[in-house]
Amino acid sequence: NFGFSQGFEVYLSPRSERRRQARVERLDNPNVALEGEDGDILDSAVEFLRAHRHERFFLYLHMMDVHQYAYSEDTPLFGTSYSDSYDNAIRWVDSLLGHLLAALNELGLRDRTLIVFAADHGEAFGEHDGEGHARNVYGEVTQTPLILGPPFRLEPGIVVEARSENVDLWPTVLELVGLSPLPDPDGRSLVPEIVAAAGGRAEPDGDGVAFAQIDQAWGRSPGRPRPMVA
């Protein structure tokens, strides 16, 4: 699990042999549908919320269905191509997040919960002669959503134009909930940018961007829909 379980009192990870087999089949046939498993994660999350509704809690949902192009056949709105499967997965996970928000409202937790929605990368579908992620730094791969839902309403919703990185998440969350900052964080708190945007002022400039070269060779085998790494 890449160490994701560190520090958690309860850690659950769904595993499906049927899902793994479907992933193998999809290497030769991009139209093979993967059944989404994030619904199981959501059910466990709601159960956790019900059990801890009267306590302070930290709940982390690592939803992987979009990463795997997996979805429920009850929700697809697009076609069956490779990129359509990705869109179907986004629609599926979006519906699950709607259920999560509904559960928070039902349990009376929404007005005292900070919600953070983030992603670690986008996905390329040939926009710059590449597919997937982790192979270039074009916008389709590096631009990701970051949505902060505080336990109070901001009217209208604030859009922060300043560039941010995922290493900024922890410093931002800690400041928003009133906890001490990390001693030597890699990122910075985005609260100054949020406050500036809320006040209609210019947002502070962030640090510069550094790029790393990944010494891997990528190629495509005839007849296979996905690139391979050498």
Segments and roles (model prediction):
Residues 1-230:
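Catalytic domains that recognize anionic headgroups
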